[in-house]
């Protein structure tokens, strides 16, 4: 069928087209089926229907299809039905609880990267693996396929070090300290990080305050070899692109299949050529890992997968029931990290966690003896070498190396949340703290967030400030404060949690 082209300048993340229902019926295709579009080149796209947006005799091409055809643009194209990709049958096999071969996983990942699958099909695969976990072999094959799906860094100098946090703890700004500590001791650590999806600030959101974070793989390699380390946004690279596409579908489903989590973490480490990796596994209430037993199982699985991939993986189970440090939100966290680098002043939880994990990497990289890594990490902070290295990293990424914590701006609108009575902080709710910080504008508003005056186990008196909320916009501050007062993110010993009034039948 010959159809006239109508471009639609909307990005949908897939090869998609729109047909009028009359033409779709004539072609014999249903919504979600595929069609082949042919002019001087040929591609396959997923079909959407309309009764009035596109007239009969025309085909609407979304941005991605238009771009793919733009070099050989014609006013009309030939459209005919196409078979479903083989991956749809592979997904059905997974749904039936059958095991996949390496070749089938390679085909599936290729189709995901090349946008040949609809989101509902990817969702079916993720749900199937959530219910029926993959075997060790399948998880290894999935990880290798994800590594091979994009760019890879190949360094001439080794070892290559890396660190990853499972997440779930607000204020986890430790990469801003770990990377310069490790690089200052002569090791290479090309740290690719994420932006916050559900949190109040990912490492990339924080580093972006100090320097650009969007670089391609070649630039990351060059900068790392020159100064020893970088702190960049992984989403700007073509490193393990299949992972980003899977995460995009996982998010609205609120699921994180175990095998996918393992593959996601290790694919990014494999793609940057990591030899030694330290995994931070926060455990406790409000984290992804509820208890030590779950943490140990995850650690064993990560170590096992690393061994299969030729990576040396060490895991640290860390305390995750309260925030790291006393700040949540990009600018506030950067200030706290810079203070530690500049003067070794800061919360014990931030210094201890950063030095412990950096120390593990220093020992794995053989620049510190057994059980001596922590001491070397602390010394690197105290003697200013970590700060000097961090300035080099900021400079090579295009930032101002002379920046200090005093130069970082925070939200101008603030309000304290006070203690309702005398006592001790018994508990802090990580998820509520993040919700409140996001209501205040974090992470998009860099100056928004929370400063904690008290943490778990610390005493206070009625009327003392427990936390200060910062916002760049007054309306966002009001929303955050209202939420914090209605449902406080902390419990003070002796405070009333809720009043339930009596009622009378009428």
Swiss-Prot record:
- Free-text function comment from the UniProt entry: Catalyzes the conversion of AMP and phosphate to adenine and ribose 1,5-bisphosphate (R15P). Exhibits phosphorylase activity toward CMP and UMP in addition to AMP. Functions in an archaeal AMP degradation pathway, together with R15P isomerase and RubisCO.
Q: Does the keyword Transferase apply?
A: yes
> NCBIfam families from the entry?
AMP_phos, ARCH_P_rylase, PRK04350.1, PRK05820.1
- Name of this protein: AMP phosphorylase
Provide a GO CC annotation, any one.
Answer: cytosol
What CDD domains does the record point to? MopB_CT (cd02775)
Q: Species name for this entry?
A: Methanococcoides burtonii (strain DSM 6242 / NBRC 107633 / OCM 468 / ACE-M)
Q: Which residues form the active site?
A: 256
Q: Which UniProt keywords apply?
A: Glycosyltransferase, Transferase
UniProt binding sites for AMP: 168, 194-199, 203, 264, 288
Task: Write out the GO MF terms.
Answer: 1,4-alpha-oligoglucan phosphorylase activity; AMP binding; pentosyltransferase activity
Which domain of life does this protein belong to? Archaea
Keyword Glycosyltransferase, does the record have it? yes
Please state which protein family the record places this protein in. Answer: Belongs to the thymidine/pyrimidine-nucleoside phosphorylase family. Type 2 subfamily.
Q: Which InterPro entries match?
A: AMP_phosphorylase (IPR017713), Asp_de-COase-like_dom_sf (IPR009010), Glycosyl_Trfase_fam3 (IPR000312), Glycosyl_Trfase_fam3_N_dom (IPR017459), Glycosyl_Trfase_fam3_N_dom_sf (IPR036320), Nuc_phospho_transferase (IPR035902), PYNP-like_C_sf (IPR036566), PYNP_C (IPR013102)
